[in-house]
Amino acid sequence: MLFSRSGRSIFPLLPPYAAHAPNPNQGHIIALPPDGLTPYLGLRARLSQVWINRWTILLLLVLVRVLLAASGLQADMSTAKREALSACTSVESMGSSMASMPHYLSQGVNELTATGVEKAVSGLKSMLMLTITGVEELVLFIIKVLYQTYLCLFTLAVRGSVHVAVGVIKEAADFLNSTVKEVGDDIGKAVSTFESAFNKFLDGVNTVASAFGASVPTLDLNSSISTLENLQLPSSIDQGLDKLNSSLPTFDEVNNFTQTVLRTPFEEVKKLVNESLGTYTFDRSLLPVPAKEQLTFCEGSNGIDSFFDSVTDLVMKARKIFIAILIVAATLACVPMAWQEIRRWRSMKERSQLVRKEAHDPMDVVYIVSRPYTAAAGIKAASRFSNSRRQILVRWAIAYATTPAALFVLCLGVAGLLSCLCQYLLLQAVEKTVPELSTQVGAFADKVVDSLQNASAEWANDANGVIGHMSQDLNENVFGWVNTSTTALNDTLNTFVDKTTGVLNDTFGGTLLYEPLMDVFGCLIGLKVQGIQKGLTWVHDHAHIDFPLLPNDTFSRGAAASISSNSSNPSDSFLADAGDQTSNKITEVVIRVVNKVEDGIRTETIISGVIILIWVFIALIGIVRALTLFWVRDRNRGEGGGARVNHHLSDAGGFIDVPLMAVSNTNTDARSMPPPAPAPRYEASTSTVVASRAVPVSSTHHEDEKLGFAGERQYGSALKVDGAADLRGSSYVEYDMEKR
């Protein structure tokens, strides 16, 4: 194709299309033959570049970023593996130290246990001595109170009765003795008088009788009277009562006997307690000392290696999946893009006819042809409005937000978010494997705790055996005598009751006082003695000692509690350092890598979001600009508005020819091609269809039309269809779009 110098000098951006016209003066564009050369790309040429469409390139960039992230994650995991193995070695050393801790702690615990036992035995000795002494004096006091009370009552009853009886007998005897003597004296006097008179009478009788040779005896009653005068009660009448009064028991013998009998077992028990617990020393050599432990769970353990190998396999698998998916997606993106190019090519060919038709706004035509999809989107959105001004503003806002630069920013942000999504999916897959490592580390901790529990249980069993043997020895050697003493005390009380009963039986047996005295004895003493015997029986049944035994988890309870699920603070684990957020140093390494990758993804997401916000800001600029002019009414010519361009009649095809004025071309080729027409220039068509002549266009009007800013061009100069009247007051062309 030949380009004239004059054509380029007059309108250098357009080639001399009229050079191919059979009649250069006609001014119509003649299509080139299908197999001819064209300065623009044809369909095949366009399809040859489908593989470098923006979506394929963006997907490939996403793939590259994901591959870089996977490589970085793999490198970080390699570093984490080394750190984890190092941490495992540290944990192994710490676990060995903890497992050996019973060896070191047992010595102090054994000393503490032995000292506690010695202090307990010393306190037991003091308590026993005080208790035995207190019980001894208490028993003696109670018995003394009992028999002295009984003695007082007995003395009051018996001695009082005897004293009364003896007094009565003495007074009766004295009264009888004095009365009998007086009666004898009186009788003696009377008898003496009678005897004197009678003897005188007998003397007379004897005088008479002597005459007859006989005599009468005299009366002599003096001896009988003397006997009556000397009559008195025998002194032995109250000797029995005096003997009974003097023979009342004072229970001194019972008191001495009882105290001797009661104190004997108590003193024996005190002696035995002093001999058994005089200076008690616990044999510390009997308590065991566990041996040291050496734990090995890093060497020959596939826990950490298998975890990181699985993570590496996961990353490699994810890399392959992303490569396959993104490459397939990038390849498949070529199919719709090829179809889009075909449709774009067809649309360009169809819309290129607008150049030959009545085109009042050539820049709009060029925009529609060059940006078919964004222009179609704008036309679709504008079809919702009936006002041509608002239609243009809507199209302008969409065109402003869909410029190549704006779409590049949007695609870049979307690609960044897609890359972050792929990295996030990869990170989530890695995070799901962290519990597996925690399980492996938990197995390490369980090994340490199991070793501690075994050592603690073995030590506790041996120590408890020693403590149990000591408790048995104390029960036999100390509390055995307590049992013996309670039995002896019960026997002593029985002896006391029997002895007292024997004394009462010997004293009052067969008398009227025996039964009442025995009832009083049973009420005052017998019931109390029975209560004491019950208490002694209870002491006999419960007199034993049981020292508390050591629990089996003495050395392992704290370690087991630190790794249990009930622990609220993960840093309490013995595998973690102070301030660690995870339960152990091994998983801390992996968590640190995951947090690092997560921070990187978060940063990239923020950057991608900011890029998308930049596009949103650009779109908002266009929307705000359109809204600013949306409600502004059209300016009339008198208010500074432009003049209305007259519309001309169309031809039978419905379009007005736009003549392309050509300039002469001095260059000819070997085929003697006709001189090309000058560069095309848009002109307003006349009312006739055939004639086409050049109509000068104002430079100011040309500049207004070329700017393309909303509100800066003549809205009435838009494309018009069929030359019909604008029923809606708009000269905006309808591109086969139904307005609603």
Swiss-Prot record:
This is Plasma membrane fusion protein prm1. One of its GO terms (biological process) is plasma membrane fusion involved in cytogamy. GO terms for cellular component: mating projection tip; plasma membrane. Residues 1-54, 159-320, 419-603 are extracellular. It is a multi-pass membrane protein. Involved in cell fusion during mating by stabilizing the plasma membrane fusion event. The chain crosses the membrane at residues 55-75, 138-158, 321-341, 398-418, 604-624. Residues 76-137, 342-397, 625-740 are cytoplasmic. Glycans are attached at residues 177, 222, 245, 256, 274, 454, 483, 490, 505, 552, 566. It is found in: Cell membrane. Belongs to the PRM1 family. Its main location: membrane. PANTHER family: PLASMA MEMBRANE FUSION PROTEIN PRM1. Keywords: Cell membrane, Conjugation, Glycoprotein, Membrane, Transmembrane, Transmembrane helix. It comes from Aspergillus fumigatus (strain CBS 144.89 / FGSC A1163 / CEA10) (Neosartorya fumigata).
